[in-house]
Structures are given as structure tokens and as C-alpha cells.
């Protein structure tokens, strides 16, 4: 895990580097201090997914790390695995499927967003993540979740898939409509409640 203080310093370094246009970023990126920060927001994440696809298409991909909260963590998986269109495709293809997100899913699984369907069935079978590409990409990924015991943000280092997919699920487990995700003795919910923009 990374402390909140370290994250704020990283954000300050990124802000001080300037250069927001794509041409400058792709040619002059300094990977020692450049991070991609992705906020959550449920279906607002579809906009982020589109922006990430354009960044990848334009070759703006040389980030040291990607940090995502909730939907941002879900989008980060497809960005790091170099799968253009995957995050948007999933949101559009399954938006009306009651296993993806529905009251029925809440009643039958305890989660409005069907955890098993999203993080196992889609992730491994219906629109699989390229785990090999994810794991071989040197870019580091962090999913921001909320530690329920302490009420503080937790920056979970997603080192490999499929092993660490529960960290992504923890980051996107919305309070009152999702079950808490337990990892290493800690219980987590959606990172948006403690640090929506890491």
C-alpha cells in the first residue's frame, strides 16, 4: 500500500510537470514522475474509458503508474492491459443485463453490481482481460478503496491479474448497495467515499 501523503506528493509532482497536450506528453514524458489519475463515478466512467482509448491510440501511454477509484480502477485495468475499447464495450454491452447492475442482483447477490458476473464471468470469459499484457506492462496500478475500520483511503497495489482482481472490486463496492470486500483482514468499500480523485 502507498500512504495518502505519498500519493499527494506524487499528484503535486505530476501537476508541476505541466505539458497537457498529447504531442508533448507522448514525446517528452518523464516516467519517473508521471501518473495517470482516474476518478470514479459509475457510468460517468464511460467518458473516462473513451479518453483512455484516445490516449492509447495517440501513443500517450508512458506513465509510471495509474491510480483509479471505483469506475476509474475498472478502467485502469483495460488501459494497463492495452485493450482499446474494452472498458466501453463492457459498459455498453452489459448495461441492460440484470447480472451486471440491477436491483435483482442486489437481492440475489448482495451487490447492485454483480461481483461474480463482473469480476469473474466478464473478466475471464465474456470479454476477457489480457492478463499477460497487464502483468508484463511495467506501469504500476493502484486501486483506491476505503478501509471501513479506519475510515481512511487505502491505496491497493494491483500487481498481477487475475490474482489481485478483488482489489479492483473493493475499490468499486458502493456503500449500502454492495457487500464489503475483505482482503488480508481488512474490510473495504468504494474508494470514492474517502478519496474520489487520488
PLM features per residue range, with description:
Residues 1-69, 77-198:
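Patatin-like phospholipase
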Amino acid at each position: 500500500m502507498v500512504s495518502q501523503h505519498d500519493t499527494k506528493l506524487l499528484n503535486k509532482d505530476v501537476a508541476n510537470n505541466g505539458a497537457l497536450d498529447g504531442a508533448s506528453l507522448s514525446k517528452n514524458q518523464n516516467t519517473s514522475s508521471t501518473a495517470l489519475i482516474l476518478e470514479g463515478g459509475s457510468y460517468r466512467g464511460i467518458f473516462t474509458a473513451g479518453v483512455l482509448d484516445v490516449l492509447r491510440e495517440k501513443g500517450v501511454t508512458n506513465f509510471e503508474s495509474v491510480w483509479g477509484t471505483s469506475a476509474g480502477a475498472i478502467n485502469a485495468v483495460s488501459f494497463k492491459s492495452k485493450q482499446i475499447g474494452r472498458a466501453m464495450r463492457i459498459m455498453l454491452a452489459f448495461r441492460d443485463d440484470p447480472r451486471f447492475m440491477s436491483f435483482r442482483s442486489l437481492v440475489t447477490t448482495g451487490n447492485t453490481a454483480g461481483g461474480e458476473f463482473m469480476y469473474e464471468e466478464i473478466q475471464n470469459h465474456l470479454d476477457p482481460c489480457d492478463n499477460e499484457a497487464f502483468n508484463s506492462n511495467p506501469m504500476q496500478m493502484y486501486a483506491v478503496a476505503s478501509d471501513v475500520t479506519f475510515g481512511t483511503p487505502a491505496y491497493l497495489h494491483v500487481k498481477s491479474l487475475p490474482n489481485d482482481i478483488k482489489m479492483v472490486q473493493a475499490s468499486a463496492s458502493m456503500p449500502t448497495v454492495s457487500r464489503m470486500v475483505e482482503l488480508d483482514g481488512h474490510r473495504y468499500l468504494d474508494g470514492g467515499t474517502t478519496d474520489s480523485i487520488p
